[in-house]
Design a protein with these regions (language model features):
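RNase H-like, metal-dependent ribonuclease domains
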Residues: 242-245, 326-400
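Mobile genetic element proteins and their domesticated derivatives, centered on retroelements
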Residues: 6, 24, 36, 40, ...
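Conserved pre-catalytic core of RNA-dependent polymerases
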Residues: 1-152, 189-190
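Basic, alpha-helical interaction scaffolds
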Residues: 247-321
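Inter-domain linker/hinge segments that demarcate the starts of reverse transcriptase
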Residues: 42-44, 70-80, 195-216
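Catalytic palm active-site di-aspartate
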Residues: 3-6, 24, 57-61, 88-98, ...
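Catalytic palm subdomain of template-directed nucleic-acid polymerases
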Residues: 97-115, 174, 185-210, 231-234, ...
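Short, conserved micro-motifs composed of acidic
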Residues: 139-140, 217-254
Length: 400
């Protein structure tokens, strides 16, 4: 039950694929092992919540929480502080190679101090030790080898174990907030000026240095970013004040990618949707090669490809952002070309006839549906488990 197959996948956006760090190994255990890990993850989550081991602003690898909750909490906080006339800055950091550096003995010590059941701790230590893996790629030897790393990627319980492992990195800031999603940490601070925010954020990596050294983890330098939030009506000079961390200069970014959401200093939705449009076009250029006129996939399978990969890529983020009129026209123009390929019609076909033939939902309707679908779980979630729900005004009816 500890033998697994490792699927080697390349990480997108890497400059050089000649180094091992440019690839990711997804581990596939036997079905019974996956089921046991999933059940243990549910049991550990329940125990951790009852014992208070999870930070209230942790949104990763927990049932009922997702990327939307983390980003919604972040945007709500800095908009609330901006309404109080504060300047808000945020530092984004990523734990480098976090899953590989988890020490089972230190993890067991953390869980023991938290009061977790000794039987569950013993099961976790057994799960992390003496695992064997066989890599799957062309020309690979079909032999199993012992894996001497922390937690395996692809395991249902690995992200949850990592969340407990780095829980000590959540610090309490007097005028700030720390939000995390597994290995992504977001540190926000507010003050009367941007330089004051820089002075408050700059010591954070140094404060956590001894904790990170004890846990054998470090922050990734290329993924460290800074942003100074602004309101659309702010007429003051744009601040380009950088932050210095470990003798390295990090200037503020004009667009930051957080959990698939593209954030700008003024939270303009066009940047996010134009990035999603570029990804959808790249996917469509690959998919359309599978089917051309009179050959390839059938029309029914073409429709499956449109509603399967393309629309989710194009509309990701509609639960938080609403596209403006100009961006919506660009999205509809791209969708028109996709539907023309799906129905094998001319590009100049009247839109009304094309939409009746292809029968897709309009982009604007999809955005509204995604927005409502995200709001419903938000108001139904317990506020002590969901940080975004905890920030809903008392006048709004919620589960509580």
């Amino acid at each position: 039950m500890k033998k697994a197959k490792g699927i080697v996948l390349d990480k997108p956006g890497k400059a050089d694929y000649r180094t091992p760090g440019s690839f990711r190994i997804i581990v596939l255990f036997e079905t019974v092992s996956e089921i046991l890990e999933r059940l243990s993850a549910l049991h550990l989550t329940s125990a951790a919540r009852s014992l208070g081991l999870l930070h209230p602003n942790e949104c990763g690898s927990l049932a009922g929480l997702g990327c939307f909750d983390a980003v919604a909490t972040l945007t709500h906080e800095f908009r609330l502080l901006q309404a109080a006339s504060f300047k808000v800055s945020t530092l984004f950091q990523d734990v480098k190679g976090g899953f590989d550096n988890v020490c089972e003995n230190k993890l067991a010590s953390i869980l023991t101090r938290g009061g977790v059941s000794p039987y569950l701790i013993a099961w976790i230590k057994s799960c992390l030790s003496k695992c064997q893996c066989r890599l799957i790629f062309q020309g690979a030897p079909k032999v199993f080898c012992l894996v001497a790393v922390g937690t395996t990627q692809g395991s249902p319980i690995s992200p949850l174990l990592f969340v407990h492992y780095i829980a000590s990195l959540h610090l309490t800031l007097p005028k700030g907030l720390v939000i995390s999603y597994v290995d992504d940490l977001t540190i926000m601070h507010c003050a009367d000026s941007v330089p004051s925010n820089i002075r408050a954020l700059q010591p954070f990596p140094g404060i956590t240095k001894w904790q990170r050294a004890d846990l054998l983890v470090a922050f990734s330098v290329p993924k460290t970013e800074l942003i100074h939030w602004r309101t659309p009506k702010d007429r003051s000079d744009v601040s380009f004040a950088p932050i210095v961390i470990n003798d390295m200069l990090f200037p503020p970014s004009q667009a930051v990618r957080l959990l698939g959401y593209w954030l700008t200093p003024t939270i303009h939705s066009s940047v996010h949707f134009l990035r999603r449009l570029a990804l959808a076009k790249a996917s469509f250029s690959t998919i359309r090669q599978l089917s051309v006129a009179s050959k390839g996939l059938s029309t029914w399978w073409n429709r499956k490809l449109v509603f399967g990969p393309i629309l989710p890529i194009l509309t990701y983020g509609c639960d938080l952002f609403i596209p403006d009129t100009i961006t919506l026209k660009k999205l509809n123009s791209f969708l028109h070309g996709v539907l023309q390929w799906r129905t094998n019609c001319f590009y100049t076909t009247v839109c009304s006839a094309l939409y009746r033939e292809a029968s897709p939902p309009p982009i604007f309707s999809i955005c509204k549906h995604r927005l409502w679908s995200a709001a419903l779980p938000l108001v139904c979630a317990p506020s002590k488990f969901n940080p975004a729900t905890a920030r809903i005004p008392e006048s709004v009816p919620t589960w509580n």
